[in-house]
Structures are given as C-alpha cells and as structure tokens.
Amino acid sequence: MADTSQKPDKATSAAQARQVIDVFHEISTLLNAELDRGTLSICISLIENGVNPEALATVVRELRKDADEVRRQIAQGVVQDGE
C-alpha cells in the first residue's frame, strides 16, 4: 500500500516553493531586474547549491550585455548566419 503521508508534504512543499518564487518575482519586478519566474527558480537553486550570489549576479549581467550586443548587431545586419 502506498504511503499517503508523503503526498500532503510534497503538495505543501510545492506550494511553498511557488510562494517563494512569487515573492522573489515581485521583488525582481520592483527592482526592474527583468527576471522571469523560471530564471529566478534556476538562480535560487544555484544559490541553494553553493553558487556565490554576487558571482551569479555578475554572470547574469554579462550575459545580458552579450545578448544586447548580439541584438544590436542583428539590428544593424552585422551578424550573419553561422556566426
């Protein structure tokens, strides 16, 4: 027979995790951090697993700068297929 005592715990944990993500998403929105719930979830998981939050923030900023540069190049027609 299956252990049903685990089901409420899993449901409660999932609800709490969603609530935490919602709170972080609200904070992200207020700070104009432009992080969606999925990205926040990944960032939180990385931090919980020992990634330095400041280093993670630096990586996110660098990735955004790189993405902005690629978008600019595409808009100017600089980037071609395969580059």
Curated annotation (Swiss-Prot):
Keyword Cytoplasm included in the entry's annotation: yes
Natural source organism: Sclerotinia sclerotiorum (strain ATCC 18683 / 1980 / Ss-1)
Name of a matching Pfam family: MOZART1
GO biological process, one term: gamma-tubulin complex localization
Assembly, per entry: Part of the gamma-tubulin complex.
Localization per Swiss-Prot or TrEMBL: Cytoplasm, Cytoskeleton, Microtubule organizing center, Spindle pole body
Keywords: Cytoplasm, Cytoskeleton
Protein name per the record: Mitotic-spindle organizing protein 1
Free-text function comment from the UniProt entry: Required for gamma-tubulin complex recruitment to the microtubule organizing center (MTOC).
Major location category of this protein: cytoplasm
Gene Ontology CC entries for this record: cytoplasm; gamma-tubulin complex; gamma-tubulin ring complex; interphase microtubule organizing center; mitotic spindle pole body; spindle
Similarity annotation: Belongs to the MOZART1 family.
Disulfide cross-links: none
Keyword Magnesium annotated: no
